[in-house]
Amino acid sequence: MDIFRKAVSSPDQAGAEAAGLRWLAQADERVVAEVVGVTGTSISTKRVRESRPSVAAARAFGEALCRVHQAGATAFGAPPEGWEGANFIGRVEQPCEPCERWGEFYAEQRIKPFLGGLPEEVSDSAFAAADAIAAVDWDVAPARIHGDLWAGNVLFQEDTAVMIDPAAHGGHPWTDLAMLELFGVPFYDEILRGYGVGQEYHQWVPMHQLHPLSVHALTHGSAYYAPLERAARATLEALR
């Protein structure tokens, strides 16, 4: 077996990621990297044999991602089975505390924790958007989501794609789709077609991008300030 070994910054990062991969794989092991070993400093997975992205593979991945989401979670913010406590988006720790309401979870655990280190003129609109999101009673069930699904964490194969490096938790399914759009992924429209997402999804893309934009504004700086503000304003407009 050809093994890929990834160094991590802490035992908790390794444990959370491994638990996330195994949890996602329970729903469809064909589209999740297989964990073969975990230490305090690394996580090892079966190496993914990559191929050129294609329409057919993107559509098949969209179908599989929908199945993974539909496997569900016990609550919003619930960590993967076999793990307790925070997980990591990249190397940044984020809370995973089970919550009954998606809006409250998303605002308090996925947006606000990353805004404190930003200039007030940037964070004010994002805080306002978070409060507005939390005030809504969203009609959605907890989905089993990857949580950090940018293009670099989607490795295409001949007939589908494989997910790596998750920040898996119970969340809103559109959060994964919106992150794919934010950072660009080959054949995005075909992924949506395979997934079967409705037109109403597009109105809420900026809201679901507030989490990754908040994280990147904190970790990567001013290049993400304007995109974060635009997403916050679009969210507030959609919620009026």
Task: Specify the residue positions occupied by each region the protein language model found.
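ATP-binding pocket architecture of kinase catalytic cores
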Residues: M1-E104
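ATP/Mg2+ or Mg2+-diphosphate-binding catalytic cores
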Residues: S10, H216-R240
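Short, solvent-exposed loop/turn segments at secondary-structure junctions
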Residues: S10, V38-S42, E50-S51, I111, ...
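Alpha-helical elements of Rossmann-like donor-binding domains used by nucleotide-donor carbohydrate transfer enzymes
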Residues: A19-W23, A60-R67, A128, E190, ...
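Short strand-connecting beta-turns/loops that link adjacent beta-strands
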Residues: E29, G40, E158-T160, L210
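An alpha-helical support segment within catalytic cores of ATP-dependent transferases
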Residues: A73-R144
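Active-site Asp-x-Gly
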Residues: P95-A107, V140-R144, A151, L155-P206, ...
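Short helix/strand-capping connector loops at secondary-structure junctions
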Residues: V205-H216
